[in-house]
Amino acid sequence: MSPLSSRNSFPEQHPLFAGFLPADREKIVARLAGSDLILVLGAPVFTYHIEGHGPHIPKDSALVQLTDDPAAATRSPRGLSIVTDLKLGIGALLAASAPSRQAPALPGRPPSLPQDRLTDRFLLQQIAALRPPGSIVVEEAPSSRSAMHDYLPMLEPDSFYTCASGGLGHGLPAAVGVALARPGRRVIALLGDGSAMYSIQGLWSAAELAVPVTFVIVNNGGYRALDEFAPHFGLATLPGTRLPHLDFCALARAQGVEGVRVTRCGELDAALRMAFAATAPVLVEVCVEKNG
């Protein structure tokens, strides 16, 4: 899937699903190494957090893009871009396709995690196990995004939303909006602690509108996603990215939203079940391992 994809367009438990591309030019090239053809359907080529260096795709790979957006076609740095109706274009491809060799085997799903470490991966696993049928995930937890595809896969259309540009603070108010647009469905807002602080006042709107949103705060004590950028700036770590002593439950209660804090694996399931069953907004602050 394209980097920073804002919705789910492929079932993530399908045997041919191989995850999302990172929003990093060098990592994209490494991930796509060995590909004869890169086929991009309805997505840009490609979106990055920062521009990066070197080629955009492996040197021995061909690229074909099908898009209904002429602007996306003009921005594509390599390959052939075709502006077309996607339904008609994909239909024509399927009618003409005849693979000449067997695709390589794909890695299997990771094993189930035990209840011994409260990591973001364990949290995602338990959300996947306990989420109500038909629920919608609105995500702004960038440092946990790659783990989501293994431990919290999206299986249905209209079940996942996030910000395509990586904008800061989008997730919390977006979850309120999705709940208003999809009445009767459970909305789960998966938010990093840093992301949530950009728009924490959205909890007041959730309380006033009485929307059934479960706000899950992945509290790792800082802007962990930014730490990955440090090498690009010639630094070991970035200053000003730690967020100690935040009390999200107190912030929630001050705005009329019930809050519960989870610090141990054994507390997690009960907190999630309570929040998923509530008819009003609930915030669950999960204090995960800093480097888990």
Residue ranges and their predicted role:
Residues 1-64, 155-184, 198-201, 232, ...:
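Glycine-rich, anion-gripping cofactor-binding loops and their flanking helix/strand elements
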Residues 84-90, 201-219:
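A short alpha/beta connector and helix-capping loop motif
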Residues 12, 105-179, 184, 234:
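Active-site diphosphate/adenylate-binding microenvironment
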Residues 20, 34, 99, 230-271:
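Conserved thiamine diphosphate
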Residues 59-145, 265-278, 282-292:
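Phosphate/pyrophosphate-binding active-site segments
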Residues 185-205, 218:
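DG-centered beta-turn motif at the end of beta-strands
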